[in-house]
């Protein structure tokens, strides 16, 4: 199976399965000289990890990361950084009854047809459990970007189902289990999740990511445009079904006179483009949105087929998120950080800045 690596200079390769022994990643291209410890990674891992809220999956993983290589006396050496997280709370028996069935909305069918074999325990490699290593790698990128350029990457839940959550404050984002910036919406979100858990259903969500203080010049025309790489990275997250950059799909209803970001000697008058022009960052904040589909693993009975192509009913047991978008906030931040880190190093290599 290919496709486990992202980046050209700052390269992140992940490995491991949902119910395997461990998850891991190798990071190549990390510059030397950054002070780094596992504590730097643990903050974001704790934000993502399961079992921390009654509104997410109750699988209880500590997600304690171990740095295997690339750091000496608390400082990066420039060599490959190896990271590993042990899986502690697998419950593979939850999947024994459906091991020969294809779960609707999951990768079971496509993995089986392509590879002829699949790990049915929690989806194996296709599980969002894999994203723990992305968050770990992204934490390293976030720290380096902030120190070197002042870049700050933050995200929040901007919608869950038909509940819109307009931005209010970054402080509020870390004060509730939904990563919602609007405290007036938290009760509605709680009630929605309670209702979904009672009915055994799930719901989709929208995450907004903002990267501040990004310098002018990140991105490479034509096929390595910054917006293309960001979209690629965000769409690689499990359950992601759409990405918007800047005004996104609302540009369909705009006129050119409305959409163009006019310039003055003091800077841009607007930011409809979301901080990227011609595939290159323009110095404005980068605005992105990601849409996540509802969790496919639900307790409601549904129709599917088995390995013999026979029609069967399926009810999925186990511990699953009623809304995967909640824990996607630190994952989305990590993917944006990995892309910006890669483009920072590429920018330096080409432009010597």
Swiss-Prot record:
NADP(+) binds at residues 48, 54. Its EC number is 4.2.3.5. It comes from the Bacteria. Keywords: Amino-acid biosynthesis, Aromatic amino acid biosynthesis, FAD, Flavoprotein, FMN, Lyase, NADP. Reduced FMN (FMNH(2)). The keyword Amino-acid biosynthesis applies. Pathway: Metabolic intermediate biosynthesis; chorismate biosynthesis; chorismate from D-erythrose 4-phosphate and phosphoenolpyruvate: step 7/7. Its cofactor is FMNH2. GO terms for biological process: amino acid biosynthetic process; aromatic amino acid family biosynthetic process; chorismate biosynthetic process. FMN binds at residues 125-127, 238-239, 278, 293-297, 319. It holds the Pfam family Chorismate_synt. This reaction introduces a second double bond into the aromatic ring system. NCBIfam families: aroC, PRK05382.1. This is Chorismate synthase. It comes from Buchnera aphidicola subsp. Schizaphis graminum (strain Sg). The lineage of its organism: Bacteria, Pseudomonadati, Pseudomonadota, Gammaproteobacteria, Enterobacterales.
